[in-house]
């Protein structure tokens, strides 16, 4: 792997961690102490949602579904926490 690839992988990992932290922060603000209850209430597979909060890559459509459950727009999500 060349230097640019390594830099990108590091950047991607950092950004996914920020995304995960933001999702978790908003879930807790909504009153969900457990990610499992949030996932269940919003019809998102629990294991899959758990991976999102751990910083694994997710599809854009999956992010939109999570944001719908959090009752926040894409714009608000990125303005306030990024």
State the predicted function of each range.
Residues 21, 32-34, 58-61:
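Residue-level signal for the short linker/turn that defines the boundary of a DNA-recognition helix
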Residues 31-51:
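Short alpha-helical DNA-recognition segment
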Residues 45-48, 59, 73:
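Short coil turns linking two alpha-helices in DNA-binding domains
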Residues 27, 39, 67:
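The alpha-helix within a helix-turn-helix
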Residues 1-30:
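A short, Lys/Arg-rich alpha-helix, primarily the initiator
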Residues 53, 70, 81:
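DNA major-groove recognition helix of helix-turn-helix
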Residues 61-76:
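DNA major-groove recognition helix of helix-turn-helix/homeodomain DNA-binding modules
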């Amino acid at each position: 792997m060349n230097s640019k690839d390594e830099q990108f992988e590091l950047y991607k990992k950092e950004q996914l961690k920020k995304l995960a932290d933001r999702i978790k922060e908003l879930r807790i603000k909504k009153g969900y102490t457990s990610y499992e209850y949030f996932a269940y209430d919003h019809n998102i597979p629990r294991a899959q949602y758990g991976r999102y909060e751990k910083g694994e890559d997710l599809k854009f459509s999956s992010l939109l579904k999570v944001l719908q459950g959090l009752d926040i727009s894409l714009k608000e999500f990125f303005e306030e926490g990024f």
